[in-house]
Swiss-Prot record:
It comes from Candida albicans (strain SC5314 / ATCC MYA-2876) (Yeast). The gene is IQG1. The modification Phosphothreonine is found at T66, T72, T82, T367. Residues 467-478, 528-539, 556-567, 586-597, 616-627, 642-653, 672-683, 734-745, 764-775 form the IQ domain. One of its GO terms (biological process) is mitotic actomyosin contractile ring assembly actin filament organization. This is Ras GTPase-activating-like protein IQG1. InterPro entries: CH_dom, CH_dom_sf, RasGAP_C, RasGAP_dom, Rho_GTPase_activation_prot. Induction: Rat catheter biofilm repressed. The modification Phosphoserine is found at residues 48, 83, 91, 139, 165, 167, 169, 369, 433, 440, 1064, 1068, 1088, 1383, 1385. The lineage of its organism: Eukaryota, Fungi, Dikarya, Ascomycota, Saccharomycotina. The calponin homology (CH) domain binds to actin filaments and is required for their recruitment to the bud neck. Residues 18-51, 143-175, 326-427 are annotated as: Disordered. It is found in: Bud neck.
Length: 1647
């Protein structure tokens, strides 16, 4: 069978129309299939394609194949069969190669020449690595139909046209049917998609983006928008640099994040080296589909093919870009949103597309991403990027131009109409799935109507199919053979590559192990990164403050202004030249208008003038004729001869002149000729060099420009120096004189002219100004109306920028100006809820104070009962009687564990009671100790007095029962003291480093002391002990970085091994590091040190990951580090967040972690068996400590020998940041962590105990009393009152000796509510009043632009201010009424309703509705002056302190609200617990009193029924003798039924005096003598005794007194030896009197 017949029949099966061609192309392609050898042109040179075309055309002419219609040679849409083959399949198939002659292949087979390139291509699809038999079974039948069998063909009507030699090449094709046009359409669609995603304008056009995309800037920005994390983008696009590969690698991270299949990926060289740029756009096209599939908020890709226009140059540029790179099959990447055909193929294709894309996006769908589009981050990034860009106006095409008035062109809005609402129809051709079967070939029968259709070809279809299969098999086997050879030759390289790939995958799995956990915090991480990037960009901003206004700067600016002026003048001149004809016409019209009136008059009188003109013309013509005649009369030949002679002489003279010049310069001419000949010879010899220099033309031009610039500058400087010599002496005076004369003359002339027409000038100026102003207003109005949306948007952007700048200034500035406060003042104008909460909290605090005082009163009464029992015991009344019948609580004595408790007298006990209150205040309120330490200079901290004070203060916080998991009360208050000391030290620091320096702080001593507790050291050893022991035990580890010491170690080793060493010990470090053995050892030590630091960081990072199995960092360390971070932020807001984090890191390493590295012996870690090993281990730990400290400070080393580790330190910055932020300072407030608060002591039933040595107690008391004026705020301070009572209480030396003998005491501290002092309350009230007044003033005088508060206060008051103030007050009053109507009732015990709901409205400003603005301002000034007199404010800084407090209220509004809410919760709980305690104490006190009374009653009235001799024994005392005085006294009482219930006794005064019960007495009128005076002691009620005086049997009137048992015990407690009765007439001895009462009326215990 003939080969030509088979080829002809194969060609006849091709389609003619574009639709069918597109369908075929789509059928043979896979959905979203990248550019490869099956559906896009491979990388052949143009010459080979042309040869293929010529072969097919020659074959067609040999077979007499003619088309039905004549074809034009240059037609693209109606091309030859070769063109059809090339355009429809876009790749030379096996058929084309088989028809090519062997002579044109230059000895290379078509397979080797064409397909070998495809083997090395990186575009091989992923299915190429699968089963090749399945691929062959799925190959299309019409795509690679090849055969060598000849078959007769049907005669065609017309021959097939071949392209002529004059046809345009694809690189010069500018039509819309060219691939370049589609390429530009796809790029434009991707550009619009990028703009919508990035939310920024891309200034480059589609043709410019072909080369601009190589820098990867837009790709990196896209990655930052989509990925959870953001990284800096290299934005320098002046030229392509190698650093742009970082942007491309950033985009690769985005592809890895979405698991982008290899089908759509590209390599770095494809983009950076422009090897295959179209594949990059195809990757973006596929990525848009995946993003839209996953998150519909991302827009879908549009299809702009046929809908946009491009210039011919742009299309040619795109075609040239596609010469060496194939055009991807973008149509397969369309989402199918356009109109679809009704055929079954299209429906199947659509389903196949969806199925394939589902597979593509399935890895992402498995784990739903929490990604959200961070709009705020995008805005911040755009602002940071745009800060460094020049201000350019962008037109619709994206090109930047300088916005300047153009006198020749009108302002025309070139922006194209918005296409946001237009429906873009995607004309996506239908496609078929890539599924073919050889047994049942798919034949498109629609070609039977074609002129190329041959029925005879159908009978040979099985043979054709078999031929195609054989051809494909042969090609495939050859390619597999070549692939196997190549793979065999690169076996070792591939092994290494696969190992690297596997390692990379393993590392990626390790890196992304916590990705899902981090995604939950993506928003916080993004905000943190945005803040960090903001600080980085702020730090990178250039500093223009150092630029001085020197002469060079002024000259440079002058040159720039001159250049701009010349360019503008040239621009105007060129514009005028363009319109020269119009200008000439316009000038002609102007001139015509000027002479029109004159010529019109002349024409009107032409009849009169015409005869005279005709006569004048006749005379003129006659004169001209006569002249011409006289000139013609001269002989021309003679004139010609004369002229020839003259010209000859002139030529000869010119030749002589030139020859003379040549002779005079002969030697120079010879040299010039020699130079020229040498140049020509060198040019011929160095053509290759010059050709290479052509590519360096830019560099040479720069060199020449530099040389010319240097020459010009030398010339300019020389002229300038010459002028400078005479500048002051001659030039400037002359110029000054001339300028003065000219200016004065011009001024006089101008003024004289103006004064002559002064009225007209004024009128003209007024009209002109009015016209200009109206025109400007009309122009602005029209512009705003036309661009209202843009104006609103611009205003919003400006407002946003201004607000951001103001907020930044408010946050970072230590002293924010008034204009910033004015902007944010409205934030405090609506604080109803906050103020109500503040009032509620204040009432709750007052209620807590009241309940605490009530509970203290109950506790005091119970303590008095305790004292009463002690006194009863002293008087031999058994306390066991009180304890037997009750199980109630017994109160412990004031001082415990004291042997000599009975030796403490009343004054000592009173002293101890005061100490209990005093040290409770000192322990629980850290501000007192902070002020005490602040009054002591830092230099005295290490002195003996300073150390004694420190040790005494430490004893106030005895942390004994604490542990890592359990926190005691003392630890809570100790940490609060550390935090307060740190805040005070930070306020006194000058830089960030001062916060962590021992000699400039007080808190470090307490922190270090607490860390030295046994349980703290044990925990740190458990945390790092194994790590340190491993370093110490490893004798091979050496971290030495000093070259001299390394050099000496080598010498010592040689001495030890060889017994001698030839090296000299006198050598410098620079010379030592040059030695190979020292250098190798140095590098090895640093590498080992780096690895050890990395291991330690890994341990801490695992701790940061939240692993509960690991040991945690103690809470107090976290709290102190967090406080250091917050203090650094408040004190130094202008520093970066990294520097703030470094403060916390230094605290953690230097003052906690470093202790086990510096002093391992304190942790029970032995550093070695001998001195050498100990020194080496300590040095290793010391170097490890230095590097860890430098790592956590995030600063490079200044030490020359440790500088090689700076790169490692910078690379570990992100890791250290994460450790600090997640593991160290990630902790709440101290109350939340310790679950304690200041009210806990008030609600507990047991008082807190404090065991302290008496010496420390006395020293602390002395220090506090000496500095009481410093540590307290005023006389109304509770601590001050307590100190005054302590000073008033005087004790004797004997008592002091007794106290010192006790060694130590355990005090039951007296919890007392801490009330605010009157001075502080008054100051706070005045500040609140001033702030409230100032807020009203700022709101009223909003239009005042003054930045000074003092100027605002003293500025004048306008009527508009009064009106504005009244409006504000009325508005607030209306809001107040609404708030009161809607307010809910609150419990009367917790809060009272307030009438005002404005901020600061609880102060005594009075009714604002009755105040005028003048009175308000006056009141504000008076309050400020009061604060100034108190020293709180100063006018030197314009009362900036007041503005700072308002700014603090604005900044901390939210935190204050949270703190207030927490305080409300704590206060409510405290009130509840205090109420429970109050009820408990009430019940206990009542039961205690009732029980004591019942016991005393029982003791006074023993059961008489149980005593058989009760008649003889009365009240359990001795038997009364019969016929005694007592006997008759009792009988008389019983006779008159007056016998008291608990007995009565009668004694004479003389007997009482003898018993020393009665000391002195005197009668009123000497009624009776002492022997006749009797005292009667009776008891009618329990604990009440009546004393009466009688003379004989007659009672003395008025001589009756009642005394209680409590009064007697009080006399004994107060050590009063005597007391008076009967209005001072009788004096008794207290002790003997009490002894008489207890003996007669109570049952005393037996000793």
């Amino acid at each position: 069978m003939a080969i030509g017949n088979i080829a002809a029949r194969y060609l006849s099966s091709l389609e003619e129309t574009d639709t069918t061609a597109t369908t075929t192309t789509t059928t043979t392609s896979n959905v979203l299939q990248p550019s490869n050898r099956l559906n896009s042109p491979t990388k052949f040179n143009r010459k080979s394609l042309d040869n293929n075309s010529q072969d097919l055309d020659a074959l067609a002419r040999a077979l007499n194949i003619t088309p039905s219609k004549p074809e034009t040679p240059t037609s693209i849409s109606k091309g030859s069969a070769t063109s059809l083959l090339r355009t429809k399949f876009e790749s030379p198939s096996a058929t084309v190669s088989s028809f090519k002659s062997t002579s044109s292949s230059n000895g290379v087979s078509p397979t080797k020449k064409n397909h070998f390139v495809e083997i090395t291509s990186d575009e091989t699809p992923s299915w190429a690595n699968k089963n090749y038999k399945d691929i062959l079974n799925k190959s299309p039948t019409k795509f690679n139909t090849q055969s060598n069998v000849h078959t007769p063909l049907k005669q065609l009507n017309q021959p097939i046209g071949t392209p002529s030699s004059s046809s345009l090449s694809p690189a010069k094709n500018a039509s819309k049917s060219s691939p370049g046009y589609e390429y530009l359409c796809r790029i434009e669609a991707i550009k619009q998609w990028l703009e919508s995603v990035l939310q920024e304008q891309i200034t480059q056009s589609a043709s410019q983006l072909i080369s601009y995309i190589r820098n990867g800037i837009h790709l990196a920005k896209l990655a930052n928008v989509v990925l959870p994390t953001s990284k800096p983008v290299f934005l320098n696009d002046s030229k392509l640099q190698f650093k742009h590969t970082e942007n491309i690698n950033r985009f690769f991270q985005l592809l890895d994040f979405f698991n982008m299949p290899d089908l759509f990926r590209f390599e770095l060289t494809d983009l950076y080296d422009a090897k295959n740029v179209p594949k990059v756009w195809f990757c973006l096209h596929a990525l848009s589909y995946i993003l839209h599939k996953q998150d519909p908020s991302y827009p879908a890709m549009n299809n702009l093919v046929g809908k946009v226009d491009f210039s011919a140059d742009d299309i040619r540029t795109a075609n040239r870009a596609l010469v060496n790179s194939p055009l991807p099959n973008f149509s397969s990447a369309d989402t199918g949103e356009g109109k679809s055909d009704t055929s079954n193929n299209n429906s199947s294709t659509t389903s196949a597309t969806a199925a394939f894309m589902d597979k593509v996006t399935s890895p992402v769908k498995k784990t739903p991403s929490p990604l959200k589009r961070p709009q705020q981050l995008q805005k911040k990034q755009l602002e940071l990027v745009e800060d460094n860009k020049p201000e350019l106006t962008q037109d619709s095409s994206g090109l930047s131009k300088i916005s300047r008035d153009d006198p020749f062109t009108d302002r025309v809005d070139l922006a194209p109409p918005s296409t946001s609402n237009a429906k873009l129809e995607l004309h996506t051709p239908p496609s078929k799935s890539l599924e073919f079967k050889i047994k049942s070939p798919i034949i498109d029968l629609s070609h039977r109507d074609s002129d190329y259709y041959t029925p005879e070809l159908e009978s040979h279809l099985p043979n054709i199919i078999k031929f195609q299969s054989l051809a494909r098999g042969a090609v495939f086997r050859y390619l597999m053979f070549v692939d196997r050879i190549l793979l065999k030759s690169y076996q070792d390289e591939f092994t290494n590559l696969f190992a690297i790939i596997r390692g990379n995958k393993a590392r990626r799995k390790t890196v992304h192990k916590h990705r899902d956990e981090l995604r939950l915090y993506s928003f916080e991480i993004i905000e943190l990164q945005s803040i960090i990037r903001k600080n980085f960009v702020i730090n990178k901003k250039p500093n223009f403050t150092s630029i001085t206004n020197d002469v060079e700067t002024v000259e440079l600016q002058s040159l720039i202004r001159g250049k701009l002026t010349r360019d503008w003048k040239k621009y105007v001149t060129n514009g005028l030249e363009k319109f020269t004809p119009q200008i000439i016409d316009f000038q002609s019209l102007v001139r015509m208008k000027s002479i029109y009136s004159k010529s019109n008059k002349v024409i009107s009188y032409k009849d009169e003038i015409l005869p005279s003109l005709i006569e004048l013309q006749s005379i003129a013509r006659s004169q001209l004729y006569h002249r011409f005649s006289r000139s013609n009369a001269i002989d021309e030949t003679e004139i010609i001869k004369i002229q020839s002679i003259i010209r000859r002489n002139a030529v000869i003279e010119d030749l002589y002149t030139k020859l003379s010049k040549v002779r005079s310069n002969k030697r120079r001419l010879i040299e010039l000729q020699s130079i020229a000949r040498g140049g020509v010879a060198r040019t011929k010899l160095c053509n290759s060099v010059l050709v290479t220099l052509i590519y360096e033309d830019g560099i040479l031009n720069q060199l020449f420009a530099k040389i010319r610039g240097d020459n010009y500058r030398k010339k300019f400087n020389s002229q300038k120096s010459e002028l400078l010599k005479y500048e002051k002496s001659s030039i400037i005076p002359v110029q000054t004189l001339f300028r003065g004369v000219l200016s004065r003359y011009t001024k006089e002339v101008t003024l004289s002219d103006i004064f002559d027409q002064i009225d007209s000038v004024i009128t003209l100026q007024s009209v002109a100004r009015g016209k200009l102003m109206r025109g400007s207003i009309y122009e602005f109005s029209d512009y705003y109306q036309k661009h209202i949306k843009q104006v609103v948007k611009a205003q919003a952007i400006l407002q946003r920028v201004f607000a951001q700048n103001a907020y930044k200034q408010l946050i970072t500035s230590k002293n924010p100006p008034l204009k910033v406060i004015r902007r944010f003042a409205p934030l405090l104008s609506n604080n109803d809820r906050d103020f109500q909460d503040e009032m509620t909290l204040s009432d709750l605090k007052d209620l807590i104070i009241e309940k605490c005082k009530a509970n203290e009163e109950y506790e005091n009464q119970i303590e008095q009962l305790d004292m009463k029992l002690g006194l009863l015991d002293k008087n031999k009344i058994s306390i066991e009687e009180f304890l037997k019948p009750t199980k109630g609580k017994t109160f412990k004595p004031i001082v415990e564990n004291v042997k000599n408790l009975e030796r403490l007298n009343k004054s000592l006990k009173k002293k101890i009671e005061l100490w209990q209150t005093l040290f409770y205040f000192i322990q629980t309120n850290p501000i007192y100790l902070t002020k005490l330490f602040n009054s002591i200079p830092y230099t005295k901290n290490q002195t003996k007095s300073g150390q004694d004070l420190f040790q005494s203060v430490i004893q106030l916080f005895p942390v004994r029962d604490s542990s890592i998991t359990y926190h005691s009360r003392e630890e809570y208050f100790l940490v609060k003291l550390m935090i307060q000391l740190m805040q005070n030290d930070t306020a006194n620091s000058n830089n960030l480093g001062d916060i962590t320096k021992l000699h400039l702080t007080n808190w470090i001593d307490f922190f270090t002391n607490f860390n030295n507790h046994t349980f703290q050291r044990q925990h740190l050893k458990a945390l790092l002990g194994k790590f340190v022991i491993r370093i110490v035990d490893n004798e091979q580890v050496d971290f030495e970085s000093d070259p001299i010491r390394i050099y000496n170690q080598i010498i010592d080793h040689e001495m030890k091994v060889y017994g001698r060493s030839e090296k000299s010990r006198d050598i410098s470090p620079q010379a030592a590091i040059q030695l190979p053995e020292v250098s190798n050892k140095f590098v090895g030590n640093l590498m080992s040190l780096r690895e050890t630091c990395s291991d330690l960081l890994s341990m801490l990072q695992k701790n940061a990951s939240g692993n509960k199995a690991l040991l945690q960092i103690p809470d107090h360390v976290k709290l102190i580090c967090r406080q250091g971070y917050l203090c650094a932020q408040r004190k130094f807001p202008d520093k970066s967040d990294q520097q703030h984090l470094a403060v916390a890191g230094v605290i953690f390493v230097k003052h906690y972690l470093g202790s086990i590295l510096q002093v391992p012996e304190n942790y029970g870690i032995l550093t070695g068996n001998n001195d050498t090993q100990k020194a080496k281990s300590k040095d290793n730990l010391r170097y490890l400590y230095r590097v860890m400290l430098q790592l956590f400070s995030m600063k490079p080393f200044n030490d020359n020998f440790l500088k090689p580790l700076n790169e490692y330190i910078m690379a570990s910055t992100d890791t250290v940041k994460s450790i600090i932020s997640q593991a160290i300072i990630n902790v709440g407030e101290i109350e939340t962590v310790y679950e304690l608060h200041d009210y806990d002591d008030l609600v507990t039933h047991q008082r807190p105990k404090l065991t302290i040595s008496v010496n420390s107690l006395i020293q602390l008391e002395k220090s506090i009393l000496q500095n009481v004026d410093i540590i307290t705020t005023g006389n109304d301070d509770q601590l001050y009152k307590t100190c005054v009572e302590v000073e008033k209480l005087l004790i004797s030396p004997q008592d002091m000796l007794t106290l010192t003998d006790l060694s130590s005491v355990t005090l039951n501290l007296n919890p007392t509510t801490q009330e605010e002092s009157i001075v502080d309350s008054k100051t706070k009230t005045l500040f609140t009043q001033a702030k409230r007044c100032l807020l009203y003033i700022i709101r009223v005088q909003e239009e005042d632009d003054s930045d000074d508060l003092l100027e605002l206060l003293i500025s004048g008051i306008k009527p508009s201010h009064e009106q504005r103030f009244k409006e504000i007050v009325q508005y607030e009053k209306a809001e107040q009424d609404i708030s009161l109507n809607n307010s809910k009732s609150v419990t009367a015990n917790t809060v009272n309703k307030k009438k005002s709901t404005r901020p600061y409205s609880g102060t005594s400003l009075g009714d604002l509705s009755n105040l005028t603005y003048h009175e308000l301002k006056k009141m504000c000034l008076e309050i400020i002056l009061k604060l100034e007199s108190m020293g709180e404010l100063t006018r030197k800084n314009s009362f900036q302190t007041l503005l700072n407090q308002i700014a603090m209220d604005i900044k901390t509004k939210d935190s204050q609200r949270q703190c207030r809410w927490q305080q409300l919760q704590v206060s409510q709980k405290t009130i509840k617990k205090l109420s429970e305690k109050e009820n408990y104490l009430k019940t206990q006190l009542h039961n205690y009193k009732k029980h004591v009374e019942s016991v005393l009653l029982e003791l006074q009235s023993k059961s008489k029924s149980n005593d058989k001799n009760w008649k003889r024994r009365l009240f359990n005392i001795m038997v009364i003798p019969v016929f005694s005085k007592q006997y008759f006294y009792h009988r008389e009482l019983r006779k008159h039924n007056r016998l008291p219930k608990f007995g009565s006794y009668k004694y004479s005064a003389k007997k009482l005096i003898d018993q020393k019960v009665l000391i002195d007495f005197s009668t009123a009128n000497n009624v009776a003598t002492a022997s006749k005076l009797d005292f009667m002691f009776s008891c009618h009620q329990v604990g009440k005794f009546t004393i009466e005086v009688a003379s004989g049997t007659v009672n003395i009137p008025g001589a009756t007194n009642t005394i209680t048992l409590d009064e007697l015990l009080a006399l004994q407690y107060e050590n009063k030896t005597k007391f008076e009765l009967f209005d001072g007439m009788a004096t008794f001895d207290s002790n003997n009197f009490m002894g008489l009462i207890f003996r007669k009326f109570y049952d005393l215990k037996k000793e």
